[in-house]
Regions:
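Structured alpha-helical segments in the cores of large, soluble enzyme domains
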Residues: 105-122, 297-302, 320
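Electropositive, gly/pro-rich neighborhoods at or near active sites that engage anionic ligands
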Residues: 1-93, 179, 184-193
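C-terminal functional extensions of proteins
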Residues: 179-334
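Active-site histidine-anchored catalytic micro-motif
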Residues: 127, 145-198, 268
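Gly-rich Lys/Arg/Thr-decorated short loops/hinges at beta-loop-alpha junctions or inter-strand turns
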Residues: 87-102, 197-202, 237-239
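Gly/Ser/Thr-rich loops at beta-strand to alpha-helix junctions
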Residues: 78, 132-138, 161-164, 238, ...
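Short acidic, glycine/serine/threonine-rich loops at helix termini
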Residues: 42, 82-86, 139-143, 166-172, ...
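Active-site pocket-lining segments that scaffold enzyme catalytic pockets across diverse folds
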Residues: 117, 121-131, 135-149
């Protein structure tokens, strides 16, 4: 016989009872008032807050748990439904049997990912990019900019570094003082990223810098021109940080979650910190592709619970041009 979930009232803000239930990132249902209710806002390592009157259940971060809330305890009346894993070769995201390998065929992976991106866009789905500064360092700014322009990016999540080096590249053609086009160092180039931070402060924001006409290219230029939202989360090592960077970690988490809401696919580009953070904020039903030159970065993402992620061991500067080309080819034939 099915047992209704057990729950108890929170006695103090942010404090859970000893036997609270901790969620996975898989779709979860609770048996409440003799019927199954789907838990909304599914994420791993969260509490489940229920409303027995409205018959609702939602994942909640510890910081959002308040006195008087009803929280699920124990394991009675809880059903977890892991997503099905298709047999090898049947699904675009089942490239090879291992999740992360340096020996996967990049060309075929790119082709399958491109087909998925075109399909999601056609169905008015949501594609989110999580990006690190290596996008700029490796010369892939123009490729990501084109993807934004073509409507294949519906939100960008990053840190201070991607913005600063993107603006440095737009202003001076360098990234960390290295001429991106020729791969050579430049005179006094070590100060270039600080020049970028200074220009951002001078303008007051990315939006104002774009409006001023000082930059006319780049990832965040395209975001502003194409109304693509972005959230930049600060860290202790940031230069600046730039005016648009959110330095309150809790607020940054909230804004990341807003962008990730209803995402169909998340592409993670060379940023271990932000990729793992995002992995913790999405359900296992969201497709994830992580591209990084370092195999251990992708392995860490998988080890921390984002088991649905497919790891592509590649330099983003090599992978993004191939992906963009594949998207253009597929778009022409449809």
């Amino acid at each position: 016989e099915l047992q209704n979930i057990q729950y108890t009232k929170i006695k103090k803000n942010f404090v859970l009872p000893e036997n609270f239930y901790s969620t996975t990132n898989n779709p979860t249902f609770v048996y409440l008032n003799n019927k199954w209710i789907e838990v909304k806002n599914q994420m791993m390592d969260k509490a489940i807050i229920i409303d027995p009157i409205k018959n609702t259940a939602v994942c909640s971060m510890l910081r959002n748990v308040n006195k008087g809330d009803f929280v699920v305890v124990g394991e009675e009346g809880i059903k977890i439904v892991p997503p099905e894993r298709p047999r090898e070769g049947l699904d675009s995201f089942q490239f090879m049997s291992s999740h992360t390998s340096t020996e996967k065929p990049i060309q075929s992976i790119s082709s399958k990912l491109a087909r998925d991106l075109v399909s999601i866009k056609k169905n008015k789905g949501k594609i989110i990019v999580v990006g690190g500064p290596a996008i700029v360092h490796t010369g892939a700014v123009d490729d990501l900019s084109q993807l934004i322009r073509l409507g294949f990016v519906h939100g960008i999540l990053a840190g201070n570094a991607l913005l600063v080096h993107d603006v440095e590249h737009a202003l001076l053609g360098t990234s960390l003082g290295i001429d991106v086009k020729h791969g050579s160092s430049t005179h006094m180039g070590h100060r270039n990223h600080i020049v970028a931070v200074n220009e951002l402060f001078k303008a007051g924001s990315v939006k104002k810098l774009v409006k001023s006409g000082k930059i006319n290219s780049g990832i965040f230029y395209e975001c502003e021109k194409n109304n693509v939202p972005y959230v930049l989360a600060g860290s202790i090592r940031d230069d600046g940080p730039a005016p648009d960077v959110i330095t309150d970690v809790v607020e940054a988490q909230k804004q990341y979650q807003k962008i990730l809401s209803n995402a169909d696919l998340v592409i993670m580009l060379s940023t271990m910190l932000h990729s793992i953070a995002v992995g913790n904020m999405i359900p296992s039903t969201v497709k994830v592709v992580a591209i990084d030159i370092n195999p251990s970065s992708v392995t860490k993402l998988l080890d921390r619970g984002t088991g649905q992620a497919i790891g592509v061991v590649s330099d983003v500067g090599s992978f993004l041009p191939i992906l963009l080309n594949d998207i253009k080819k597929i778009s022409k034939t449809r």
